[in-house]
């Protein structure tokens, strides 16, 4: 299955968000071809984190985690960059917390929900 390059996906995300009146900015540029993508959504003081994960079918799903304060989010992003220097980080500020993610948004789960499902499946 052919995947769009990350820089193209980020450009589309920025266009969707900014076209709807949200503020969106690239906080960190990663590998243009295949860098992982994290999206931070700011709603007031709350920060939600959306990360992409590849699932067994080969599809990519978004997972939501948070809310976090500024300090916790900075710690998370710093650790992510240390582990993966190719990562992209985009921040979107929207009054209703809309993430503007692409069509792969059908499944959003918190990290705790993912862990619980894995536990009950015996993994």
Predicted feature descriptions by range:
Residues 1-123:
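Polybasic/polar functional segments that serve as interface/processing modules
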């Amino acid at each position: 299955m052919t995947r769009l390059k990350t820089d193209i996906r980020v450009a589309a995300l920025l266009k969707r968000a900014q076209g709807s009146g949200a503020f969106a900015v690239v906080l960190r540029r990663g590998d243009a071809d295949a860098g992982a993508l994290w999206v931070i959504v700011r709603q007031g003081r709350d920060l939600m984190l959306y990360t992409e994960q590849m699932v067994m079918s080969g599809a990519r799903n978004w997972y939501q985690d948070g809310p976090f304060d500024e300090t916790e989010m900075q710690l998370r992003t710093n650790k992510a960059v240390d582990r993966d220097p190719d990562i992209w980080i985009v921040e979107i500020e929207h009054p209703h917390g809309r993430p503007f993610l692409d069509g792969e948004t059908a499944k959003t789960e918190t990290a705790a929900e993912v862990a619980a499902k894995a536990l009950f499946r015996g993994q």
